[in-house]
Curated annotation (Swiss-Prot):
Self-association and partners: Part of the 30S ribosomal subunit. Contacts proteins S5 and S12.
Protein source organism: Mycobacterium leprae (strain TN)
InterPro entries for the chain: Ribosomal_uS8, Ribosomal_uS8_CS, Ribosomal_uS8_sf
Gene (name only): rpsH
Gene Ontology MF: a single term: structural constituent of ribosome
Protein name: Small ribosomal subunit protein uS8
Length: 132
């Protein structure tokens, strides 16, 4: 069965593993998922990630991050632009999550960027997800 929205599946697996306090989660690999994982790592939402060859294709293994008393680093994840309803934002109208405390992941002509990086570069694009 083909997957309609692999990014939503990726975010759902992260959300579920985070809710269950798992230390790591395995998802099917794709370049866009690896780029999203890199943004989450740079922003401090996950500890690390790596790619492994599985029996069928590659897998992306993400190590989740928790505080000293097991409080979650990721409070929420939300898919914004979906296959049935694409959401775009211009560089002057980039959305903010929790007044700038969260991160907006945007697909631009310069690759995947956070809202702050896109504003600094003056580019807009497709709003993929909110993370807080």
């Amino acid at each position: 069965m083909t997957m309609t929205d692999p990014i939503a599946d990726f975010l759902t697996r992260l959300r579920n593993a985070n809710s269950a306090y798992h230390d790591e989660v395995t998802v099917p690999h794709s370049n866009i998922k690896a780029n999203i994982a890199q943004i989450l790592k740079n922003e401090g939402y996950i500890r690390d990630f790596r790619t492994e060859d599985a029996r069928v294709g590659k897998s992306l293994i993400i190590q989740l991050k928790y505080g000293p008393s097991r409080e979650r680093s990721i409070a929420g994840l939300r898919r914004v632009s979906k296959p049935g309803l694409r959401v775009y934002a211009k560089s002057i109208n980039l959305p903010r999550v929790l007044g700038g405390l969260g991160v907006v992941i945007i697909s631009t002509s310069s690759g995947l960027l956070t809202d702050r990086q896109a504003a600094r570069q003056g580019v807009g694009g497709e709003v993929l997800a909110y993370v807080w």
